[in-house]
From Swiss-Prot:
Stretches with biased composition (Basic residues): 213-222, 291-305
Stretches with biased composition (Basic and acidic residues): 48-61
Superkingdom per UniProt: Eukaryota
Family (UniProt): Belongs to the UPF0607 family.
Sequence ranges of Polar residues compositional bias: 78-97
Any one Pfam family match given in the protein's UniProt record, by short name: POM121
Species annotation: Homo sapiens
Protein name, UniProt field: Putative UPF0607 protein ENSP00000382826
Location of the region described as Disordered in the Swiss-Prot/TrEMBL record: 48-99, 186-229, 291-311
C-alpha cells in the first residue's frame, strides 16, 4: 500500500500554464541585396567610362619597355632614358587601377581620372620631344633613335660594347675554375671565347690544360685497384672443433714404482711425526731438568741456613 506521501511523489502532476505575451515586436532589418547591387553596377559603369586614349599610351610605353630590355643599354644616360617611361607607366597604372572604396559622386571621380591620364600623356610626349629616345644598336648618333621610329633590325643582337662589363662570363669562369675546363675541343673553343681578351689572362689560360691533365692523372692513380692484403692461413687444429683438446699424457709408471713412491711418502710423513714427538720430549725433559736443578739449589740453601743457625 502507498502512503499519502508516496502518492504525492509518484502521482501525476498537473501541467504548468505559462501566460502568453501580449505585446508585439516588429524588427526591421535592412536587406543586404539593396546595398551590394548598386556598388557593383557603379564599378561596371566606371570601367566602361575609362578613356581609350589612356590604353593606347599604355600599349606604346609597354612596347618601348620591351624593346629596351631586349637591346640592353650600357651607358648611364640610356639607363635613365629607359627608367623614366617606366615611372610614367607606374603612375598611369596606379591612377587607372586604384582599389579604393567608392565614395561620393562617381562621375566626379571619372573626370579626375581623365585629367590625370591626360597629364601623363602630355608629360610622355614632352619628354620624347626634348631629344630623348629609345636605345638602339643601329642608330647613327650615340646608339639612340628618336621616339616613333622603329629599329631597322630588331631581331639581331648587338655586339658587346667595350665599355660594358662582362659579368656573366666572368661569373661562369669563376664557377668553373681553371682546373675544371671542358675536355672536348668544341667546348674548349667556347671557353676561350668566353674569356676576356687580356694578355695576362691568355697566358694563364694557355698554361691551364697541363695542370688539368696532371690533376686527372692524380685522380686516375688514386682511383686504381686497391691493395690486396695477404690473408694468413687458419691454424690447423689436431682435434675437432666441437670437442675440446685431448687430456695431458702422464708418464708411464709400473705398479712397483708406484708402490715404492707411496712407501717413501709414508716414511717421510712418519719421520716428520717422530721429529715433532722428539722435540716435545726434549722440551719436557729440559723443563724437568731445570725444575730439578732449581729444587736442588733451594734445598742446599735451606740446609746451609739451618747449619749456620745451629752453630
Amino acid at each position: 500500500m502507498l502512503s499519502a506521501r508516496n502518492s504525492m511523489m509518484f502521482g501525476h502532476l498537473s501541467p504548468v500554464r505559462i501566460p502568453r505575451l501580449r505585446g508585439k515586436f516588429n524588427l526591421q532589418l535592412p536587406s543586404l541585396d539593396e546595398q551590394v547591387i548598386p556598388a557593383r553596377l557603379l564599378k561596371m559603369e566606371v570601367r566602361a567610362e575609362e578613356p581609350k586614349e589612356a590604353t593606347e599610351v599604355k600599349d606604346q610605353v609597354e612596347t618601348q619597355g620591351q624593346e629596351d630590355n631586349k637591346m640592353g643599354p650600357c651607358s648611364n644616360g640610356e639607363a635613365a632614358s629607359t627608367s623614366r617611361p617606366l615611372e610614367t607607366q607606374g603612375n598611369l597604372t596606379s591612377s587607372w587601377y586604384n582599389p579604393r572604396p567608392l565614395e561620393g559622386n562617381v562621375h566626379l571621380k571619372s573626370l579626375t581620372e581623365k585629367n590625370q591620364t591626360d597629364k601623363a600623356q602630355v608629360h610622355a610626349v614632352s619628354f620624347y620631344s626634348k631629344g630623348h629616345g629609345v636605345a638602339s644598336s643601329h642608330s647613327p648618333a650615340g646608339g639612340i633613335l628618336p621616339f616613333g621610329k622603329p629599329d631597322p633590325l630588331p631581331t639581331v643582337l648587338p655586339a658587346p660594347v667595350p665599355g660594358c662589363s662582362l659579368w656573366p662570363e666572368k661569373a661562369a669562369l669563376k664557377v668553373l675554375g681553371k682546373d675544371h675546363l671542358p675536355s672536348s675541343p668544341g667546348l674548349l673553343m667556347v671557353g676561350e671565347d668566353m674569356q676576356p681578351k687580356d694578355p695576362a689572362v691568355l697566358g694563364s689560360s694557355r698554361s691551364s690544360p697541363p695542370r688539368a691533365a696532371g690533376h686527372r692523372s692524380r685522380k686516375r692513380k688514386l682511383s686504381g685497384p686497391p691493395l690486396q692484403l695477404q690473408l694468413t692461413p687458419p691454424l690447423q687444429l689436431r682435434w675437432d672443433r666441437d670437442g675440446g683438446p685431448p687430456p695431458a699424457k702422464l708418464p708411464c709408471l709400473s705398479p712397483e714404482a708406484l708402490l715404492v713412491g707411496q712407501a717413501s711418502q709414508r716414511e717421510g710423513r712418519l719421520q716428520q711425526g717422530n721429529m715433532r714427538k722428539n722435540m716435545r720430549v726434549l722440551s719436557r725433559t729440559s723443563k724437568f731438568r731445570r725444575r730439578k736443578q732449581l729444587l736442588r739449589r733451594r734445598k742446599k740453601t735451606r740446609q746451609g741456613r739451618r747449619g749456620g743457625s745451629c752453630l
